[in-house]
């Protein structure tokens, strides 16, 4: 009889600990933060930035004259202290990214949960934006999502620099629907990265028929200084009852003082060349009880409620 009682007590203890852990996890009121590794354009850089503490990356995407996504390439000029010329063929990068974000793959990085594609649509005419979205969707579906069969699990943000290129969003969505995978739009978010007036950004989303899954970026190269006025406008919109923004991120943040300022302004993400710097600040006594590094269980389209 005693062995059975002992077994029951052990099981009860394990279940109690699990329940307590679950409650503590759900009770965590700290703001989740996405640490975005900046300008990750070579496959080898994926591991490099994740190992430094990034849980998300930003990748540049250039287009050819026919609106096909061609390379993961930034070019000169770029951030101070960085090599501007690293690149991959876009589809090769997608395959490498898929390996890094597919559970069970030998190259899987569990911490990598979100990818921002900085779409260099400045080389395109306005009337090519819809076609660019369609071609981007086809490439992602085949080479990243593996045609919907156990592809990469990371959330994707399509970051567009020009408000006039909002038809890219519709083209992307229409192509996924046409190819039989509209459910993948659940994994896709949006950003306009041109530092336009917040009201103008909202109007562009209305034209695109988008409500939800909205990240709002603000920033400038690390070679220059930029204040946080527009960041505060974006966070005010996010926190208002009728705002259209779900998350706000600031770029490029490489210094501890700038990181603290951004966190104090209430951002959800910080784009950086030095993820370890951001991690260090998050561990400081003034911030570790207010913020935490986001995990895959954190919905990147959900507005954080204090």
UniProtKB/Swiss-Prot annotation:
Function comment: Dermonecrotic toxins cleave the phosphodiester linkage between the phosphate and headgroup of certain phospholipids (sphingolipid and lysolipid substrates), forming an alcohol (often choline) and a cyclic phosphate. This toxin acts on sphingomyelin (SM). It may also act on ceramide phosphoethanolamine (CPE), lysophosphatidylcholine (LPC) and lysophosphatidylethanolamine (LPE), but not on lysophosphatidylserine (LPS), and lysophosphatidylglycerol (LPG). It acts by transphosphatidylation, releasing exclusively cyclic phosphate products as second products.
Residues the record marks as active site: 38, 74
One GO-annotated biological process of the protein: lipid catabolic process
Main location: secreted
Pfam families: GDPD_2 (PF13653)
Lyase is among the record's keywords: yes
Cofactor notes: Binds 1 Mg(2+) ion per subunit.
Residue positions binding Mg(2+): 58, 60, 118
Positions bearing carbohydrate: 283
InterPro entries the record matches: PLC-like_Pdiesterase_TIM-brl (IPR017946)
Family in the record: Belongs to the arthropod phospholipase D family. Class II subfamily. Class IIa sub-subfamily.
UniProt name for this protein: Dermonecrotic toxin LiSicTox-alphaIA2ai
Secretion signal span: 1-18
Broad class of enzyme this protein falls into: lyase
Cofactor(s) listed in the protein's UniProt record: Mg(2+)
Propeptide regions on this chain: 19-26
GO molecular function, one term: metal ion binding
Disulphide bridges, residue numbers: 78-84, 80-223
Protein's cellular compartments: Secreted
Organism: Loxosceles intermedia (Brown spider)
Tissue and organ expression note: Expressed by the venom gland.
Enzyme Commission number: 4.6.1.-
Cellular-component GO terms for this entry: extracellular region
Catalytic activity entry: an N-(acyl)-sphingosylphosphocholine = an N-(acyl)-sphingosyl-1,3-cyclic phosphate + choline; an N-(acyl)-sphingosylphosphoethanolamine = an N-(acyl)-sphingosyl-1,3-cyclic phosphate + ethanolamine; a 1-acyl-sn-glycero-3-phosphocholine = a 1-acyl-sn-glycero-2,3-cyclic phosphate + choline; a 1-acyl-sn-glycero-3-phosphoethanolamine = a 1-acyl-sn-glycero-2,3-cyclic phosphate + ethanolamine
Keywords: Cytolysis, Dermonecrotic toxin, Disulfide bond, Glycoprotein, Hemolysis, Lipid degradation, Lipid metabolism, Lyase, Magnesium, Metal-binding, Secreted, Signal, Toxin, Zymogen
